[in-house]
Amino acid sequence: SSLVSSVCAGELKKEGRQLKTFSFDFTDNENYFQSNSFQPSMDKPYAAKMASYLNSHHTYLECTNQTQADYLLRSVKAHDLPCMADIDSSLLYFCEQVSHTHKVVLTGECADEVFGGYPWFHRESMLDCGTFPWTPTLAPRKSLLNADFANTLRMEDYVKNAYDRAVSEVDILPMENETETSRRRIGYLSIRFFMQTLLNRMDRTSMNTGLEARVPFADKQLVSYVFNIPWEMKAKGGLVKNILRQSAVGLLPD
């Protein structure tokens, strides 16, 4: 996270110390990168700009396709169950590289869940999809299983029951309109399920390499406070994570 890095750099500067930062990429990513809803642009140019702005001791790490494959089995063992394949194996590799010189790091994980950065917070079709927005269909998962076996699992019923039970836990405010209520539910689902998955992934992966990854944006008090901030403040002017951006004025380059 650029904001986390900036705050840390400022504190270390008071002590005459230089912040050490890392960024990660995939080999030849500049040749094959395709913009998407989760990552509209490449990170590397912004990481370089931020490192220069903070005058941090910055290290670029790259992961090849072969390395991703080599770390797959170890990644599964770190999770004790099948996981997110190449995404997790590359994270394991990067954590291992960082662990050679550091034992504790701060990450920017969870900012999108807490401050509403994902597409499902902004697209009406995803707000009211009636299921977990990051998994609108089970077809890709069911395709991995024998059809008869998949049918006995009744996966759709399981997901629907889990979704209905989760949204019933959300406290609805009487002054909110239908759209605001939908965003409140989406926010709860993102924190209750999506964020928990990422936190577990980060914890298991980093600790497997002897690295402790701390997540400032997952601070309980911060999450509780931001959850109840009105959406028109969180995304003022339609700008994604606007309130977080405003809090960073003067701390980040324009």
Predicted regions and their residues:
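ATP-dependent adenylate-handling active sites, centered on carboxylate activation for C-N bond formation
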Residues: 1-175, 182-186, 201-251
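Core structural elements
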Residues: 190-198
